[in-house]
Amino acid sequence: MNIKKIVKQATVLTFTTALLAGGATQAFAKENNQKAYKETYGVSHITRHDMLQIPKQQQNEKYQVPQFDQSTIKNIESAKGLDVWDSWPLQNADGTVAEYNGYHVVFALAGSPKDADDTSIYMFYQKVGDNSIDSWKNAGRVFKDSDKFDANDPILKDQTQEWSGSATFTSDGKIRLFYTDYSGKHYGKQSLTTAQVNVSKSDDTLKINGVEDHKTIFDGDGKTYQNVQQFIDEGNYTSGDNHTLRDPHYVEDKGHKYLVFEANTGTENGYQGEESLFNKAYYGGGTNFFRKESQKLQQSAKKRDAELANGALGIIELNNDYTLKKVMKPLITSNTVTDEIERANVFKMNGKWYLFTDSRGSKMTIDGINSNDIYMLGYVSNSLTGPYKPLNKTGLVLQMGLDPNDVTFTYSHFAVPQAKGNNVVITSYMTNRGFFEDKKATFGPSFLMNIKGNKTSVVKNSILEQGQLTVN
């Protein structure tokens, strides 16, 4: 899922003379004050101050992904020979799990463990009421190889892989899929894409009968959200940058249709570059914190990564035919913190909007956060479009720190709201792709997380079946 990119860097005066002459600390402090500014761009931010509190906070078990018993973990029986990782359920407009002719439906990325380029969306289904990992049936690939050409879409024709997204059960009983069209032909170009998936039921079987209305929705405008052309123009993979435009999550609010997605900021709302290191809005905390942290960052080995870090959870409005209606400001950004905030997920619960994202410590620029740290971060607002404030004061919702070679390693945590109560079901995948001959990437055991206002906590002793979606 991780792609490299680069963009133009803002030019900022260096302090070579001051460093050679001594007094480096004073020179940095003076320069920081001269260059400092505060610009929020009208959006919420994942701040350095909040993130720096997380290494201590994550020691609390209420934020820790449960430990799982390796001996109980099974491969998905109906996915023989396949690794299965990122997954998402067919959901109703309010985010609860839909029932399709008596079944729960899950879409997931799957492919051969021996071929990293083999990444396609498969459809799995399970009778409502059955929770066993062995009860999941596999309807196969959603798209035929020819579908990207049959769509007569200039972007789709260059697709080489299918990446994560979401699916909604429409008011007229249709399955509408949203996913990421990835092209290895164009420096990792990613585009938000949709199709109607036609499914029929026969006896105890769901069958995919092809797709229709298969089309590209959005591939970045450059101004609000970075596009791949900017990445290409300014150095592509050689920069250490990370271009993202993926993981579209469908949501409705007050009769309007939206996609929330992973992205990077564009040129008009907080672009990457050295000057971003002087924006107080990205730091949080007070003046003293900004002065100390910005000076430290300027001299850090992570300075370059921080300059390039401009992750965003973006939002666009859709027309009723699922074409682009309006490009909107990001819901939240992670400038100077990380370039990658994945698996966008948002829903309304008890009158509040909850926004979640997954991220890796290895992509972050925060002292105390390690490369093995895996996070789900969360934010809350009174409206879909924000402003968003961090849950649990910092945004920490879940942390997992296992070695990637551990069979019980999990990632791509996804919160599934329930029809009743204050608990959500957390799903994930378990075991990294291609790491073991006999242990495939599979649905991880689900578990419960409680949400109450601006606080969350993992529910003790709440481990469920692998891939379980509901408890009501």
UniProtKB/Swiss-Prot annotation:
Keyword Metal-binding assigned: yes
SUPFAM superfamilies: Arabinanase/levansucrase/invertase
GO terms under biological process: carbohydrate utilization
Site (Transition state stabilizer): 247
CDD domains reported for this sequence: GH68
EC number: 2.4.1.10
Gene Ontology MF terms in the entry: levansucrase activity; metal ion binding
Active-site residue numbers: 86 (nucleophile), 342 (proton donor/acceptor)
One cellular component (GO) term of this entry: extracellular region
Keywords annotated in UniProt: Calcium, Carbohydrate metabolism, Glycosyltransferase, Metal-binding, Secreted, Signal, Transferase
Disulfide bond residue pairs: none
Enzymatic reactions: [6)-beta-D-fructofuranosyl-(2->](n) alpha-D-glucopyranoside + sucrose = [6)-beta-D-fructofuranosyl-(2->](n+1) alpha-D-glucopyranoside + D-glucose
Location(s) in or outside the cell: Secreted
Inducing factors: Induced by sucrose when expressed in B.subtilis.
Function: Catalyzes the synthesis of levan, a fructose polymer, by transferring the fructosyl moiety from sucrose to a growing acceptor molecule. Also displays sucrose hydrolase activity.
UniProt name for this protein: Levansucrase
Species: Bacillus amyloliquefaciens
The encoding gene: sacB
